[in-house]
Amino acid sequence: MAVLIAVMGSDRRYAFLAELLRAEGHAPVEPAEADLIVTSSPPPGGVPAGKRMAACGPRSAPEGHFDLLKDEEYLVDVAYMTAEGAISAAMNASEAMIADSDTLVIGWGRIGKALTELLLSLGAHVTVLTRRLSARGEIEVIGAHAVATDDAAEAIEGKRLVFSTPPALVLDEAVLRHAAQNARIIDLASPPYGVDLEAARALSLRAWREPGLPGRYCPEDAARAILAALRRGGVLDD
């Protein structure tokens, strides 16, 4: 028997997800009629009584509901989509190629790791800023250079591309004063964000945020990742 599913989301990945579900016999319906609500985050009014919900956005699902952010395979997929989208955004905004460029990646979480791997594969010289002493050996062994977060001001000097991933302010005015004028600085973090954009503007630096890259850069693959996670979680039958 087909599961009645409501898809609630504002970017194109949810339109693709609705089409994928329809192709499998799960015709999308309104939330009030649904057995399962798939959403980017819990709706403001809460989930209607008796409904199941799968959340795949930055806020966790309510207790007792399926949270895609607890699916490690999904999170790794999203990290690579985000990293590839961020590199695409950087290439579109830069007048130089990635190969042989001096690049700074801030953070060594899933997105930071994916970014570093992809940038190295393109021939970039990558420095990774991390708070974790234990991560430095892992960073160095893949061919990147590890620097402590406390040394951010020194690390940003001369970098053509800068990617900030952790949701903590690292690139404040004091650090940004050391950035090159031709730098492209991309904030990939969720709130409270990692770059002081107001300070960057005051210093005539080009810095901006790139939220929701999977839904904008590769929405069809992002939708397939959600569908696969729903299956792994037993929310949908194979």
What is the role of each PLM region?
Residues 4, 27-29, 33-35, 51, ...:
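Residues at the starts of beta-strands that form the adenosine-phosphate
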Residues 5-16, 21, 99-120:
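Glycine-rich adenosine-cofactor-binding loop
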Residues 20-36, 42-45, 148:
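A short, well-structured beta->alpha microelement
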Residues 24-32, 122-142:
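NAD(P)-binding Rossmann-fold cofactor-contacting core
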Residues 42-49, 139-215:
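Rossmann-like adenosine-cofactor binding region
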